[in-house]
């Protein structure tokens, strides 16, 4: 297919940075960029990530963001292409929900997007997952898009999917998942 020309109101004035992770040359660049963005968010963080198996630094930064009043909303896939991943995702989702984040499970299939929007100001779009393997060992490439209009468009997609194709993780949902499912979350 053909690339679509940017005909948005901010065409030609967007600031886009490439954050390229090479395990040998720039091993921590994406990890540090994510932690910095989360740690400095003031109002809202919206995340879509299928492998929400969180390294401890990202987990800690998200919990601190919630504590300082940032609206943290995370969308994860209910289904996965890796068998063990759903248990770990559910465990991390539950822990963040208990800390005050809003967690949504996407029911429209496997949502493979990796997007983070911060304070309606900028967004990250790319290949990096928020897990230790992706942030420590894999070759990854993300774009940092410093543009309110683009971020707003991504937020609208997030809100549409959240409101039409997701269910929210609540204490009641967690309670009804049953003992065996929760035990598997804890083990893995």
At which residue positions do the language-model features occur?
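Charged, low-complexity intrinsically disordered terminal segments
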Residues: 1-188
């Amino acid at each position: 297919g053909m690339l679509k020309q940017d005909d948005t109101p901010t065409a030609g004035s967007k600031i886009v940075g490439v954050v390229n992770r090479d395990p040998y040359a720039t091993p921590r660049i994406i990890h540090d960029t994510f932690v910095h963005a989360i740690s400095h968010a003031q109002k809202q963080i919206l995340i879509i990530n299928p492998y929400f198996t969180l390294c401890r630094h990202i987990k800690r930064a998200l919990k601190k963001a919630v504590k300082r009043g940032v609206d943290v909303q995370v969308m994860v896939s209910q289904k996965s292409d890796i068998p063990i991943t759903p248990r770990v995702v559910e465990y991390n989702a539950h822990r963040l929900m208990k800390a005050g984040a809003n967690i949504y499970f996407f029911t429209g299939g496997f949502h493979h997007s990796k997007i983070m929007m911060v304070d309606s100001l900028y967004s990250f779009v790319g290949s990096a997952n928020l897990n230790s393997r992706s942030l420590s060992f894999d070759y990854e490439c993300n774009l940092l898009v410093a543009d309110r209009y683009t971020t707003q468009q991504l937020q609208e997609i997030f809100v549409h999917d959240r409101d039409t194709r997701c269910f929210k993780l609540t204490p009641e949902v967690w309670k009804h998942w049953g003992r065996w499912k929760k035990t598997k979350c804890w083990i893995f």
